[in-house]
Amino acid sequence: MTYENSTVNRWHENPDSRLRNGGDTIDAHQPRVATLCHSLAAHMGHPLIGSDLLLAARNHDEAERVLGDMPAPAKARFPELAEAYAIAEREVLRGMGLDWKLTAKEEQMLHLCDKLDAHMFAVSRGVTGQERDEARALINVMSDKFKAREWVAAQMGANQ
């Protein structure tokens, strides 16, 4: 585990200056995701004892300290590059002693909370428009898998 402050900025390639210059780092983002995962697990009655969910949530972007952050649009446009990056991320994380095992359900929970945090950060910066609406639609689809739409709404309401 590293203890220095992160210089890994999130949103660094985003065309919206409110996000690009918003000051969000992985050191701020990862604890928020862990908090959301903890809350979602409690809402769902999902046991955390024996689970690596919070470890993964708290450290899921640590490889970016070594590799940098690959923007989501680049991952979407070049899936083969995204897969190579994912392999490199896993290798770097293992080298840091961060090797967790998640169930498929926990992977989905982590993904939902990661996207939800990004959406809430964008909302907090006043971002509107199609990209925000698309993110909200994705979050709704994901939250429906867990019957957690009310939970998502409560999290977003607490963030307003």
Where are these regions (language model features)?
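Divalent metal-dependent phosphate-bond-processing catalytic cores, especially two-metal-ion Mg2+/Mn2+ enzymes
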Residues: 102-160
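Post-HEXXH active-site segment of zinc metalloproteases
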Residues: 70-87
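Active-site-flanking alpha-helical
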Residues: 63, 67-68, 121
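Histidine- and acidic-residue-rich, metal-dependent catalytic cores
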Residues: 37, 86-100
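Alpha-helical scaffolds flanking conserved acidic
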Residues: 46-59, 104-112
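Alpha-helical phosphate/pyrophosphate-handling elements in metalloenzyme active cores
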Residues: 19-53
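Active-site flanking loop/helix segments enriched in acidic
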Residues: 2-29
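Short active-site segment of divalent metal-dependent hydrolases/proteases
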Residues: 59, 63-64, 117
